[in-house]
């Protein structure tokens, strides 16, 4: 399980150094093999271990290519999926097209989200956090049943 938000730098080749606290787990779970793709709803990238991504691919394969909405999701997620291998120095090369899509420059936020990471441009991340907090504080929507059961 991945959790926490960490600022990492992209080098001039588009590689990010995976924080050391995750390296052993990534090597154990997937021998450092990762898959990166776009997020359909946020200006960030999604980074999965290969085994976690293969579960998603199985789900995507069950969608109908004859249904326009399902085909769009397949096209966007699979069409942007890029395999990346963690090197001996613990770095991952993020494809240029993906970096461009998410507006990633030098400072990137690596955000743990259970079975995946999100990769955000640092400034976009902080703005998103502010927007999310503002939305939570001003919402008049009733809580979903699942949120009502969440005790922190």
Swiss-Prot record:
| Localization per Swiss-Prot or TrEMBL | Cytoplasm, Nucleoid
Phosphoprotein recorded as keyword:
no
Show the GO cellular component annotation of the record: cytoplasm; nucleoid
Task: Note whether DNA-binding occurs among the keywords.
Answer: yes
Signal peptide residues are none
Write out the GO MF terms: DNA-binding transcription factor activity; transcription cis-regulatory region binding
User: Could you tell me the keywords of this UniProt record?
Assistant: Cytoplasm, DNA-binding, Repeat, Repressor, Transcription, Transcription regulation
List, alphabetically, the SUPFAM superfamilies matched: AbrB/MazE/MraZ-like
* A Gene Ontology biological process term: negative regulation of DNA-templated transcription initiation
Q: Which positions are tagged coiled coil?
A: none
UniProt subunit comment = Forms oligomers.
The free-text function statement in the UniProt record for this protein reads: Negatively regulates its own expression and that of the subsequent genes in the proximal part of the division and cell wall (dcw) gene cluster. Acts by binding directly to DNA. May also regulate the expression of genes outside the dcw cluster.
This chain's protein is named Transcriptional regulator MraZ
**What gene is this protein a product of?**
mraZ
């Amino acid at each position: 399980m991945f959790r926490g938000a960490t600022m990492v730098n992209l080098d001039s080749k588009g590689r990010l150094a995976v924080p050391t606290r995750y390296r052993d787990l990534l090597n154990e779970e997937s021998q450092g093999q990762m898959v990166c793709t776009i997020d359909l709803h946020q200006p960030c990238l999604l980074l999965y271990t290969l085994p976690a991504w293969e579960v998603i691919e199985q789900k995507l394969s069950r969608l109908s290519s004859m249904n326009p909405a399902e085909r769009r999701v397949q096209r966007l997620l699979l069409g942007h999926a890029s395999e990346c291998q963690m090197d001996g120095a613990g770095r991952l090369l993020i494809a240029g097209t993906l970096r461009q899509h998410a507006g990633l420059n030098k400072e990137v936020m690596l955000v743990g989200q259970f079975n995946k990471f999100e990769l955000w441009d640092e400034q976009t991340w902080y703005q998103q956090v502010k927007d999310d907090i503002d939305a939570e504080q001003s919402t008049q929507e009733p809580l979903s049943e699942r949120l009502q059961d969440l005790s922190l």
